[in-house]
């Protein structure tokens, strides 16, 4: 047994065992490597009760070896931790230097040309730089350039529909509805009822409907959508604490989404939009976030999911299932046996663009490359996530797979490993387009 010098050790004359007491911070001393404070006393035999014989030389040597082993392990742990820290620091510093250099290239060489004439931009250079991650200082501008503005959204247009949104917000937060919203966390039926009402109102606004109560329908739609937005905001990047009530971007998120549902009543609010708008707000000003959100949702590969187009969505889901079958046959076979298909995971990943499923820093890099590489990158990412967790998924039941998909945000995901997986997946846009045509 390891004993201590008289400054840290003590004996209990009433204790008949032959072990010395350890200091209260013994574990801390070992785990922090401060084992030099553990002093093996040559005269440790004196610490024994007088009624017991002194330690033998063999015991003394045994305890000496134990002490030296603790020292050796602690030293080895400290050295390993120091090397790991040094390695991580070097990687971090290299990334910082790389981003500084990249920012200069983006600001001086790429963005000016892109803004002047997009056809003359160096696409190869843009893609190479994007794989390293976009510098935060220019990310918002690059996203806007990639998304474009085919809808010709202006600040004036945003302010017009923001005015409509304020009316809907005021009606939504009136005492009767406010009471219902505040109880939504206690009653899951609130969420269901609101979404059912939303679908009903959308139906009443369809081109086939000849109701003369159009204005009332619009106000009801805006109010219902606003209620849904206020609910879902509470679960949007909750760990950041900036979008929830009282957070610095809470009102901005309401403004962007409120203006959007008034601008596009044919689409309204769809679950997942809070994450999209929040991601844009993290990287650009409010008006630009509205412009980007509007044009992003309007793009060919996203619009069917937000319009809940039952003729368009199945094509994308079938294309994803075919991709899994072609590139990861064993997983596809298992999924088919237990009844899992792309509809169980892809819709949520597309409507949130992975920002709900993946850590924020990883999702941000995914966004960079989706906007640069195009929609095909969505399916490369989706397949890479399935491959990343293939050891779990390939032996899971239906319920276990669904649980894994739902709890992805709680899973630890290595950014480097995930992107290595993505890079290993080769998908041809033209072949994928043919799958969509089937």
Curated annotation (Swiss-Prot):
Cytoplasm as a keyword? yes
For the biological process aspect of GO, one term held by this record is:
contractile vacuole organization
Q: Where in the cell is it found?
A: Contractile vacuole membrane; Cytoplasm
Keywords carried by this UniProt record: Coiled coil, Cytoplasm, GTPase activation, Membrane, Vacuole
Q: Does the keyword Cytoplasm apply?
A: yes
Molecular function GO terms recorded: GTPase activator activity; small GTPase binding
Name any GO cellular component annotation.
contractile vacuole
Give the coiled coil ranges: 54-104
Record PANTHER family: RAB GTPASE-ACTIVATING PROTEIN 1-LIKE (PTHR47219), TBC1 DOMAIN FAMILY MEMBER 12 ISOFORM X1 (PTHR47219:SF15)
Q: What does this protein do?
A: May act as a GTPase-activating protein for Rab family protein(s). Required for osmotic regulation by the contractile vacuole in hypo-osmotic environments. Essential for periodic fusion of the contractile vacuole with the plasma membrane and consequent expulsion of water from the cell body.
Q: What is this protein called?
A: Drainin
- Organism classification, top ranks? Eukaryota, Amoebozoa, Evosea, Eumycetozoa, Dictyostelia
